[in-house]
């Protein structure tokens, strides 16, 4: 029997889903919803934080992508997510690296993907899963990574195309997604996290900025539509983050990426609603399915 609530998340690399939405995913799995993750690349260009695994990196053996499939599998087991896939199949699109790096020019880089082809792959998933809710990044990909921007483009175009009966009927019956959310962090929450790091004597990764308003992924609180409380599933998110060991170092309530600067692990995760109707007239929603039937 198909679960009545179905959530699809579209992300660029393994680990993005856990950092942005791990608590949300674990919560909805626990509540009996269908949670599907669609990851667009294997994350081949990521920096390796584990010294004994450094030779996996792109500049050495270039085997990191395959290793990260295993990390993603372990993370999904930690979150309880059974349905996780790669856009077009594992390795169809390669990690494009950070903006302005030589990896951007790789022919297989996701940044260079044929958008029509990539959208068709995503539409096939949307029409199969038939999610009421889709989660992805904003138009800047959160912080400007080429693959995040491309994941946004593919997800948003796929939502439109999947609803059009005239578009590729061979990919399944048309399906209209009721709500689309973009991942975000409210400015007030970022300020609190920076203050918490400072209280511990830790340097914030954003210390050089005059104000959190300058951060591309920090949004005014009034633009936030939902705050999903997943604190009851914090241990699952913590375990999933630890599963991505080549990319993330976890230390108590904080984590670090390759910059080795601490960020707070959020048990409550935040979203902007960009398609569909809010489920509550006042304040932030506490449920991405708020206002939907069933």
From Swiss-Prot:
It holds the Pfam family PIG-L. SUPFAM superfamilies: LmbE-like (SSF102588). Belongs to the MshB deacetylase family. Gene3D superfamilies: LmbE-like. Its cofactor is Zn(2+). The gene is mshB. Zn(2+) binds at residues 13, 16, 148. The keyword Zinc applies. GO terms for biological process: mycothiol biosynthetic process. Catalyzes the deacetylation of 1D-myo-inositol 2-acetamido-2-deoxy-alpha-D-glucopyranoside (GlcNAc-Ins) in the mycothiol biosynthesis pathway. It comes from the Bacteria. Keywords: Hydrolase, Metal-binding, Zinc. It is an enzyme of class 3 (hydrolase). This is 1D-myo-inositol 2-acetamido-2-deoxy-alpha-D-glucopyranoside deacetylase. The keyword Metal-binding applies. NCBIfam families: mycothiol_MshB. Binds 1 zinc ion per subunit. It comes from Geodermatophilus obscurus (strain ATCC 25078 / DSM 43160 / JCM 3152 / CCUG 61914 / KCC A-0152 / KCTC 9177 / NBRC 13315 / NRRL B-3577 / G-20). HAMAP family: MshB. It catalyses: 1D-myo-inositol 2-acetamido-2-deoxy-alpha-D-glucopyranoside + H2O = 1D-myo-inositol 2-amino-2-deoxy-alpha-D-glucopyranoside + acetate. One of its GO terms (molecular function) is N-acetylglucosaminylinositol deacetylase activity. Its EC number is 3.5.1.103.
């Amino acid at each position: 029997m198909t679960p009545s609530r179905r959530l699809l998340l579209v992300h660029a690399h393994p680990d993005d889903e856990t950092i942005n939405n791990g608590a949300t995913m674990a919560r909805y799995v626990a509540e009996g919803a269908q949670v599907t993750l669609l990851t667009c690349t294997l994350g081949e260009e990521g920096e390796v934080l584990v010294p004994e695994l450094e030779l996996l990196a792109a500049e050495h053996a270039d085997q990191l992508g395959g290793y990260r499939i295993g990390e993603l599998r372990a993370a999904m087991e930690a979150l309880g997510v059974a349905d996780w896939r790669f856009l077009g199949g594992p390795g169809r699109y390669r990690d494009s690296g950070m903006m302005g790096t030589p990896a951007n020019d790789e022919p297989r880089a996701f940044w260079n993907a044929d958008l029509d082809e990539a959208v068709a792959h995503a539409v096939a998933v949307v029409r199969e899963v038939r999610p009421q809710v889709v989660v992805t990044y904003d138009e800047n990909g959160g912080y400007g990574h080429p693959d995040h921007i491309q994941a946004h483009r593919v997800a948003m175009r796929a939502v439109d195309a999947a609803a059009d009966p005239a578009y590729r009927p061979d990919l399944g019956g048309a399906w209209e997604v009721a709500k689309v959310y973009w991942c975000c962090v409210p400015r007030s929450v970022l300020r609190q996290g920076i203050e918490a790091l400072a209280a511990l004597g830790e340097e914030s990764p954003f210390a050089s900025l005059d104000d959190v308003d300058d951060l591309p992924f920090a949004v005014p609180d009034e633009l936030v539509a939902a705050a999903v409380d997943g604190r009851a599933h914090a241990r699952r998110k913590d375990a999933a983050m630890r599963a991505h060991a080549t990319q993330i170092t976890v230390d108590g309530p904080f984590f670090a990426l390759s910059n080795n600067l601490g960020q707070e692990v959020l048990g409550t995760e935040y979203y902007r609603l960009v398609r569909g109707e809010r489920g509550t007239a006042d304040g932030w929603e506490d449920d991405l399915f708020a206002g939907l039937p069933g």
